[in-house]
UniProtKB/Swiss-Prot annotation:
Record-given protein name: Na(+)/H(+) antiporter NhaA
Organism: Vibrio parahaemolyticus serotype O3:K6 (strain RIMD 2210633)
Signal peptide from the UniProt entry: none
Taxonomy, superkingdom: Bacteria
Reactions listed under catalytic activity: Na(+)(in) + 2 H(+)(out) = Na(+)(out) + 2 H(+)(in); Li(+)(in) + 2 H(+)(out) = Li(+)(out) + 2 H(+)(in)
Sample GO molecular function, one term: sodium:proton antiporter activity
UniProt entry tagged with the keyword Protease: no
Family of this protein: Belongs to the NhaA Na(+)/H(+) (TC 2.A.33) antiporter family.
Topological relation to the membrane, as annotated: Multi-pass membrane protein
Organismal lineage: Bacteria, Pseudomonadati, Pseudomonadota, Gammaproteobacteria, Vibrionales
Subcellular location(s) per record: Cell inner membrane
Cellular compartments per GO CC: plasma membrane
Amino acid sequence: MNDVIRDFFKMESAGGILLVIAAAIAMTIANSPLGETYQSLLHTYVFGMSVSHWINDGLMAVFFLLIGLEVKRELLEGALKSKETAIFPAIAAVGGMLAPALIYVAFNANDPEAISGWAIPAATDIAFALGIMALLGKRVPVSLKVFLLALAIIDDLGVVVIIALFYTGDLSSMALLVGFVMTGVLFMLNAKEVTKLTPYMIVGAILWFAVLKSGVHATLAGVVIGFAIPLKGKQGEHSPLKHMEHALHPYVAFGILPLFAFANAGISLEGVSMSGLTSMLPLGIALGLLIGKPLGIFSFSWAAVKLGVAKLPEGINFKHIFAVSVLCGIGFTMSIFISSLAFGNVSPEFDTYARLGILMGSTTAAVLGYALLHFSLPKKAQD
């Protein structure tokens, strides 16, 4: 039994599978006699914040820290290091964010409250998408994995910018000042070639608290900390950035993201009507993910190649690109996160229907994306 559990957690797809299980359990509990207990637990206050708040603002900051680390590594020595390798996934990512947002706006342009959710279908759940791709094992070319990873990382970076610019509340000048000072201290530590992680974590904790109180979403502190961690260690030392990235990954994949899914996917269907489910808000999200993502990613990718701006990565074709573009319609955790920012404190009903739209679009995209990859990839494993 222990060997079975150990082998499961070694699977590339394990994180995505756990996300699905956590979301399914949450939905089941929320619509059972335990539903009130579930909601009561999430709204229990611990050290001045609810459990839900700690998960969404606290633990998710660690997830965004991991994103910051991954983006920095890819920019300095990975798939985004050179213009030639970065331009193709970057163009694809722009299309993949623009088209879903436009579809959502087309559906909800006449609703001044619903329009604030325009960024919900622009996100891609990197863990879920990579997990689905991993189910196909070595049939997937390495270049296609790199393309999806680079695209999703750029997408995540875009989401970070969107949150900072469009989902920020009333600002506290004093808290912002402390945040800017702490940011300066972090990058001063980097400039002084401090490679011990403890000083970064202490200053980072103060930064997180300052950002939490500033009106800017606290998870953005995680990205700043990630960018400040040095890539190179002193002579004879391991890379601090890679060490932290390696250490955080299992906690994020197998702990934080499933916990986030459990806390946010538990939607009570009581009072949910078919007319509400087919209204402009959930339809705009579901179709934004299901149609907007592949439309934007594929059309921008195709245009970039045909115009000579970028080249297709070696070993993959446009059938593969289209399959991946459908897979990127899995918004799930990132889309739910943006929904909580857009509607969480404004309209619980909007938030409920938004999450149902996310689940409909993401689930369909996962099934279709897997099927398209299955039929478009070589039948035999790649070397």
